[in-house]
């Protein structure tokens, strides 16, 4: 299992229901020269289904565990769901996805000052292969504990959503059902209900003793090896255009061009080994980007497949870098 992380905070302890989320894609401009006001004024239409994919509902009852094999995602041409190059409609859909949660940031407001021009310029850069990520913002959040966060510029976040919209549906369909977080329909409620169902199943509805092992991966995001992740991405993304964009995002080093926002004194509260600025160039993903969350699930699918297929653990669930295994025998755990 080619992961460089070590497991921490493991402990074995005795102990005596899913709504699919639709894609955020919306209808966009078919004419690049359409008026910005008409684009901004339209309401969000119904979700567009992606050709070659299907929406599924995962039952919360987990008396049986679905085990999936790791298979490469279909390319854009093979699935007929993507274009050989980014279309302007795809870019506008990604813009609306990004705007949903970032519309009031300074970077978003600046981008929307000349929205049509900026979208066209960004599209031209992507088609020509001239796109390069810009400056990032570094700041610290203090709850629940001090953590260094890196925020990409709004235009770069649009590109993250563009890549995600094109390649994520097929890849996420190959992930096990027990991989939670950063996947549509698999948030905290999904994870909690699935874990409860597993406990009920393994304990025969609380009638048998049950043990659990809880662990997490130390310093997960800053310890991700980009070289390993790159190989995993190359196995999953077969369409050259999208793989090149994924590589550009992956190997972009935000430490080369960033500014610190907020109280700089808070940086001292973050342990040095948990800071991205203190890692080797080929280690670490910036916490705060959609691309990092998506890449992390691909990275840890190796762990999921190992636990399911090699260890053959029936009752297992993972939420980002935290995972739980259930068994009736503490020795087995």
Regions found by a protein language model. Name each.
Residues 146-176, 279-308:
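Conserved pre-motif C helix in the palm subdomain of viral-like polymerases
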Residues 118, 126, 198, 202-320, ...:
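Conserved polymerase palm-domain catalytic core
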Residues 111, 183-184, 288, 292:
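Conserved, non-catalytic sequence blocks in retroelement Pol enzymes and Pol-derived host proteins
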Residues 78-81, 164-225:
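Active-site-proximal segment of RNA-dependent polymerases
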Residues 135:
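Extended, charge-enriched "interface" segments that sit outside catalytic cores
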Residues 96-109, 139-150, 174-178:
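Glycine-/proline-rich flexible loop or hinge segments
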Residues 1-120:
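Non-catalytic, polymerase-adjacent accessory regions of viral genome-replication enzymes
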């Amino acid at each position: 299992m080619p992961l460089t992380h070590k497991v921490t905070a493991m402990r074995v302890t005795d102990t005596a229901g899913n709504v699919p989320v639709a894609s955020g894609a919306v209808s966009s401009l078919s004419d690049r020269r359409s008026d910005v006001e008409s684009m901004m004024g339209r309401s969000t239409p119904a979700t567009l289904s992606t050709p070659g994919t299907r929406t599924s509902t995962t039952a919360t009852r987990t008396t049986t565990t679905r085990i999936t094999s790791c298979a490469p995602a279909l390319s854009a041409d093979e699935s007929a769901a993507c274009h050989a190059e980014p279309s302007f409609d795809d870019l506008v859909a990604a813009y609306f996805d990004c705007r949903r949660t970032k519309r009031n940031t300074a970077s978003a407001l600046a981008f929307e000052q000349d929205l049509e021009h900026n979208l066209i310029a960004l599209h031209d850069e992507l088609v020509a292969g001239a796109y390069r990520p810009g400056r990032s913002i570094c700041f610290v959040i203090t709850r629940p504990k001090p953590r260094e966060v890196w925020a990409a510029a709004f235009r770069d976040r649009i590109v993250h959503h563009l890549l995600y919209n094109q390649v994520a549906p097929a890849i996420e369909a190959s992930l096990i059902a027990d991989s939670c977080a950063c996947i549509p329909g698999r948030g905290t409620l999904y994870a909690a209900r699935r874990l409860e169902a597993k406990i009920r199943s393994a304990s025969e509805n609380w009638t048998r003793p049950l043990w659990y092992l809880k662990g997490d991966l130390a310093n997960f995001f800053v310890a991700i090896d980009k070289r390993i992740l790159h190989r995993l991405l190359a196995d999953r993304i077969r369409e050259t255009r999208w793989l090149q964009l994924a590589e550009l995002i992956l190997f972009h080093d935000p430490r080369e061009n960033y500014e610190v926002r907020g109280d700089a004194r808070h940086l001292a509260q973050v342990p040095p080994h948990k800071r991205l600025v203190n890692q080797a160039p080929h280690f670490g993903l910036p916490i705060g980007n959609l691309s990092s969350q998506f890449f992390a699930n691909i990275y840890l699918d190796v762990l999921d497949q190992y636990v399911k297929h090699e260890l053959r653990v029936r009752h297992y669930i993972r939420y980002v870098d935290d995972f739980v295994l259930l068994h009736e025998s503490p020795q087995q755990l």
